[in-house]
Each structure stands twice: as structure tokens, then as C-alpha cells.
Amino acid sequence: MRLKSFSLILPCLFGVMFSQIANAQSGENTYKQVCAACHGTGVLNAPKFGDKAKWAPLIAEGQATLTAHAYFGVRGMPPKGGNPNLSIEGFSDAVVYIVNNSGGNWKTPDAKMTAAINKELEVRKAGTKKP
């Protein structure tokens, strides 16, 4: 019975693990294709990838706030990083990738975090909150 239970759980564990790996690769790819042009070089004072000192105050804003504000456009950054076709999911994966390589330790957004990001986006769209 234990072996049968284990054989049922094992695929789920691998599915979660591979999903996280795929999200990390997706975040890295989005970073390279969209974000690196500015965050790789520091253009227009964009915090450079890996610069822990520059990223620390942004990371301190929290995952939902930073992701939503950046997706909406903030501090000279264009909405969606300048790619009008970039989904919030793809953008969120890229933010996690950047943050985790710049001093943070964020997880790929789950349903609860995605809801918090979307709620913060709605607040930004309504113009009731300024960064």
C-alpha cells in the first residue's frame, strides 16, 4: 500500500518541480528578451541585474507591489517593460528571476500572490496609489 501511495505522489512532486524549473527558465528568457536592454546596462537609471544595493529598496516594497507597479509602468519604466504583448504571468516570472538574482528570494506567484498582484494593478489603474 505504501508503494502504491508513493507511486501516486511521486508524479505530483515531479510535476511541481518541473513547473518551477519551467517558470524559472521562462523568467530568464523574458528577462533576456525584454528586460535586459535596460536592466542589463542601467539605462535611464534602471537598477542593474544583480545590483543588490539598488534592488534592496525595491524588493522591500514586496512582490505584489513591485510587480504590479512595474507592469503598469513606474519611475521611467514603460508599461510591460515596453512589450505590449507581455502577459502579467510572463512579466511576474521575469520579476522573480531578476529579484532572485539581485538579493531577493521570491517564489513564482501562486494563485494568492497573483490575486494580490492583480488587485494592486487595479488600484494603480484607478489612480488611487502612487509609487
Regions found by a protein language model. Give the residues of each.
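Sequence context surrounding c-type heme c attachment/ligation sites in exported
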Residues: 25-36, 56-68, 85, 107-108
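Axial heme c-ligation environment in periplasmic c-type cytochrome domains
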Residues: 69-93, 98-121
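Sec/Tat signal peptide C-region and signal peptidase I cleavage site
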Residues: 17-24
